[in-house]
Amino acid sequence: LQKITTVAPSTTATALTSLTTGKPPGEHGIIGYKINVGNQLLNSLRWTTGRGAVVNDIDPISFQPVTPFIGEKVPVVSPMEFSESGFTSAHLRGADYLGYSMPSNMPQIISNSISQGYRLVYSYYDGLDKVGHIHGLGTYFNAEIAMIDFIVGQILETLPSKTGLLVTADHGMVNVDNSVIQINNEILQQTNIISGEARFLWFHPTRGCETNLLIELNNLYSEYAWVRSKEQILDEGWFGRQVSAQARERLGEIALLAREPVAFIEKDRPGPKLIGRHGSLTE
């Protein structure tokens, strides 16, 4: 096993798009889980806003302009339920999508693709992420890792000689459980919208409140989190050396990133109760 560093933010949509395009978030533009698009929050995994599905209103191909897999037609072995999603169009377009209904199908579908002469096959399994969110790191998580190890073993048995298998995670996770901090009402009153997720939040301030909001966030939460302005983050290259104008526009003005195993939520929009969470920069 080799320890690697994922992208910022360490979240599924951002990391998977970097895997399939070879580009950092600042270039591909999927800069987080919930992204501000015209003062509405796009859930980048579900490609929905508060109005429901928006695949016809927010074009995935325009939103994420980098061609996946450098334009090669690659078989993608992934859960069947994702085959026609907006996010799939954004980060897997042009691929030959081979959906599986059960994880046990993966080895055979991969083997069939290789036997047809494909030089690269891409596969995705989301079970460990789900278990981590629901149960956290521990016995359930370890049991799921054992399940993955079995699947990997089955894949290895089907591969012809001189075929390599690379297994990687898209991000890590920490146990948060009930360590949840409700964002102060005075902060919310100075904020137009909050994008991102509970361990990497972007604040989009109301006009004239940016400086005061930065100070107050530091005063309230610096014990638990990093507070950075957008310019600091861009100058330090968190999203890569090149950040497109399109990606830059989607960022808020101030970022709040959990340093401790905590989550930040809005009282009126707490989201699902999760034990394991990701999104920040911690190991």
What is each residue range found by the language model?
Residues 1-283:
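Feature captures the catalytic ectodomains and active-site-proximal regions of enzymes
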